[in-house]
């Protein structure tokens, strides 16, 4: 297009540049956009086709693998008929039956016993003429057979018992200790019952000296009520008598006292027969212990001292001006023998326990005490 063909727009000057036209550029840009969209759509379609194709191949491969696994695990089976068995050989002719022989009863009893648990093979039965009815069986032979039968039965039982014991230690651990059952019962008339296990507080009236056996007494310091706590059975001030023995030995610090009877201020008496205890319930009564040390070792120590000084004086007089002293030489054998004899006579002196009057002790009730024969309850 030349300049001559361009129409002159009104309001413009000659030589002035006019407005550019955009019609041609706009149409070219639209073509580019359409071409780009077409290319993008084509690529998307190709990608979708590729994805569907890959998924179909994966499903086909999975189906083929599953089919192969299933077909490979099925074993091949063949059905064949077993070969026919060979014909049985002809049976030999049966021998004629032997005449029946009567058998004595002891022999039949012996044959009915089970075999002993050993590895001895069973022997064939041999016809014994002594078992026939024509033979005479005496009483002694019958007793012998009975003893043999009992011996075989006992041996069989012992073998079975040993087999159970040899089963191992686990078998013994699976069996617990069998204990006898105990039945519960109710205490009768608890209003007049002082139950076993109660403790009576008591103060000594007499001094205890274990040198010789003796008697003892104490006074109850607290009221004792019935098992249900409703009835006063033993009043405070009741007297309890007992006895003790001279049985204290070396190393012992308690004495055993047996309290035998209780007497209330109202004249009610009952046999107690229960042991003494300390205020906390410990068995036995504690006290002061005299071990008699000087009585046991004083004579021997005195004789040993006399012997030592005698040897020293003898050596001092006979040794002149020597400054050395030997206490293991010289005479004094008779003095040494006297010391051994004295120690032998006094070493076994037993200790003595002393417990003064007025000290608090306890008495453990060892049995149920029933006062229903002397007491009664009346409604108010």
Curated annotation (Swiss-Prot):
Principal location class: membrane
Sequence segments annotated as region (Disordered): 1-26, 78-102
GO cellular component terms, semicolon-separated: plasma membrane
Record's subcellular location: Cell membrane
Membrane topology, record value: Single-pass membrane protein
This protein's UniProt keywords: Cell membrane, Membrane, Transmembrane, Transmembrane helix, Virulence
InterPro entries: T4SS_VirB10/PtlG, T4SS_VirB10/TraB/TrbI, T4SS_VirB10/TrbI
Record-annotated disulphide pairs: none
Family the UniProt entry places it in: Belongs to the TrbI/VirB10 family.
Protein name: Type IV secretion system protein virB10
């Amino acid at each position: 297009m030349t300049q001559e063909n361009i129409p002159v727009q009104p309001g413009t000057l000659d030589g002035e540049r006019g407005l550019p036209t955009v019609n041609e550029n706009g149409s070219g840009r639209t073509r580019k956009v359409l071409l780009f969209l077409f290319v993008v759509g084509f690529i998307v379609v190709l990608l979708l086709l590729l994805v569907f194709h890959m998924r179909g191949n994966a499903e086909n491969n999975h189906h083929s693998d599953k089919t192969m696994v299933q077909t490979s695990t099925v074993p091949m089976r063949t059905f064949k008929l077993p070969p026919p068995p060979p014909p049985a050989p002809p049976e030999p002719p049966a021998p004629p039956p032997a005449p029946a022989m009567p058998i004595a009863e002891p022999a039949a009893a012996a044959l009915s016993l089970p075999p002993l648990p050993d590895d001895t093979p069973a022997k064939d039965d041999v016809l014994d003429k002594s078992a026939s009815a024509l033979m005479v069986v005496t009483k002694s032979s019958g007793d012998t057979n009975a003893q043999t039968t009992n011996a075989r039965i006992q041996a069989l039982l012992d073998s079975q018992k040993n087999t159970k014991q040899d089963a191992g230690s686990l078998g013994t651990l699976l069996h617990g200790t069998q204990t006898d059952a105990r039945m519960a019962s109710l205490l009768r008339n608890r209003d007049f019952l002082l139950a076993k296990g109660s403790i009576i507080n008591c103060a000594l009236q007499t001094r205890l000296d274990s040198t010789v056996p003796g008697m003892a007494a104490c006074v109850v310091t607290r009221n004792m009520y019935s098992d249900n706590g409703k009835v006063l059975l033993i009043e405070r001030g009741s007297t309890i008598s007992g006895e003790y023995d001279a049985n204290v030995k070396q190393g012992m610090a308690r004495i055993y006292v047996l309290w035998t009877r209780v007497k209330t201020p109202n004249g009610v008496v009952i046999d107690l027969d229960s042991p003494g205890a300390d205020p906390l319930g410990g068995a036995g009564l504690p006290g002061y212990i005299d071990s008699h040390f000087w009585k046991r070792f004083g004579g021997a120590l005195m004789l040993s001292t006399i012997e030592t000084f005698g040897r020293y004086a003898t050596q001092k007089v006979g040794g002149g001006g020597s400054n050395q002293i030997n206490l293991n030489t010289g005479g004094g054998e008779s003095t040494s023998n006297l010391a051994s004899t004295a120690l032998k006579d006094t070493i076994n002196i037993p200790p003595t326990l002393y417990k003064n009057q007025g000290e608090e002790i306890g008495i453990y009730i060892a049995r149920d005490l029933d006062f229903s024969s002397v007491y009664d309850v009346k409604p108010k």
